[in-house]
Regions:
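Bacterial Sec-dependent N-terminal signal peptides
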Residues: 1-40
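Function-determining sites in protein domains
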Residues: 36-218
Length: 218
């Protein structure tokens, strides 16, 4: 093999290596960006074993036995008691259920229930936000970790779901999590005004997630 051919092969190898590195970097960067901006799609139907039983307990204890009218969300700490909140279409109430111990580690738990009436228009805005968040979810988003809090959003009666895990501050998911936490706090004290005060944030974040939805179909 002459010197010129060796140089050409070396150049090709260098270019291919560089391209491979750039591809890996691009995927890593993309995953990082998505982890900050989107939820992660969650397919409960694929759960098996202990995880499946855990989801069944969540539905049974916190989400009206899985019989949901419209939208819902859960807050699932790694070690503390979980929360589930869903919309009761018949009474136009947000229903929050909280357990005193972590369901994963406890055979028996106590459930506390709280209710807060909201207007139909407010319910529609919350549903619109949740729908945009779930439909813009991406498998590139980081799904979860070992220690923290998992937040799950459910729409269409729980048919579609997506989640995030302890998102970083000032990200889209963190803004969504803040709304979930504020909704939970408002329902606990039956404060309809506090729910209504979240409307500007809800509308703003809905627009952001809808723009991410549009990106998926460009």
């Amino acid at each position: 093999m002459n010197k010129k051919i060796k140089q050409i092969l070396l150049l090709m190898l260098t270019r291919n290596t560089l391209y491979f590195i750039l591809v890996l970097f691009g995927l890593s960067f993309s995953a990082g960006v998505n982890a900050q901006s989107r939820l992660y799609p969650k397919g409960r139907e694929h759960s098996q074993g202990p995880l499946k039983r855990y989801h069944e307990k969540i539905d049974s204890l916190l989400l009206n036995n899985g019989k949901l009218d419209d939208f819902a969300f859960t807050i699932e700490p790694s070690f503390e008691g979980e929360q589930g909140c869903y919309y009761d279409n018949e009474t136009s109430e947000l229903v929050l259920k909280v357990v005193n111990k972590n369901i994963w580690y406890s055979a028996k738990v106590e459930v506390a229930e709280y209710r807060c009436s909201i207007s139909r228009s407010t319910a529609s805005l919350i549903e619109e936000l949740f729908s945009a968040a779930v439909l813009s979810s991406s498998y590139l988003a980081q799904p979860n970790g070992l220690d923290g809090v998992t937040y799950e959003v459910l729409i269409n009666g729980g048919y579609y779901t997506a989640e995030c895990w302890s998102p970083k501050k000032d990200t889209n998911c963190h803004k969504l999590v803040r709304i979930l936490e504020e909704l939970s706090a408002a329902v606990k004290i039956n404060d309809q005004v506090a729910v209504e005060n979240l409307i500007p944030e809800i509308k703003e974040l809905t627009t952001v997630f809808k723009e991410l939805c549009d990106c998926l179909f460009v």
